[in-house]
């Protein structure tokens, strides 16, 4: 019982990072929306931003090409995936999910 209590006390102070994803694109490039972004796991928030309508967000996050996917950990950018010159996302769902997993595991 003492060991169980000790383990509980050790891990009760562990807090997990809040992971969030923002998918930046524009209406004129909707054919290249990254549809699988909504299937990513272990993210508290997955959001979409149309940079043509939300220019403030475009400037704030320095979006130069769309689509762009940014992973935020506790509100700070930790990874960015951008489209190629043809405005198509080159990263795969697996690559983005691997980065999310790596960020989550870095807390341990």
Regions found by a protein language model. Name each.
Residues 4-13:
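Sec-dependent N-terminal signal peptides
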Residues 50, 61, 88-92:
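Extracytoplasmic/periplasmic, Sec-exported soluble proteins
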Residues 61-72:
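Structural micro-motif
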Residues 16-49:
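Local sequence-structure signature of Cys/Sec-based thiol-disulfide redox active-site neighborhoods
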Residues 52-57:
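N-terminal post-signal-peptidase region of extra-cytosolic proteins
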Residues 71-108:
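Non-catalytic, surface beta->alpha helical segment in thiol-disulfide oxidoreductase systems
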Residues 11, 36, 59-60:
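Short, flexible, glycine/charge-rich loop motifs used to bind or transfer phosphoryl groups or to couple energy/partner
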């Amino acid at each position: 019982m003492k060991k169980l209590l000790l383990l509980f006390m050790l891990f009760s102070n562990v807090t997990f990072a809040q992971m969030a994803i923002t998918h930046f694109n524009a209406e004129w490039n909707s054919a290249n929306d990254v549809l699988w972004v909504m299937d990513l796991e272990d993210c508290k928030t997955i959001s979409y931003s149309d940079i043509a309508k939300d220019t403030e967000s475009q400037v704030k996050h320095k979006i130069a090409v769309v689509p762009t996917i940014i992973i935020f950990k506790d509100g700070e950018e930790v990874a960015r995936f951008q489209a190629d010159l043809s405005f198509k996302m080159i990263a795969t769902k697996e690559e983005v999910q691997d980065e999310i997993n790596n960020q989550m595991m870095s807390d341990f």
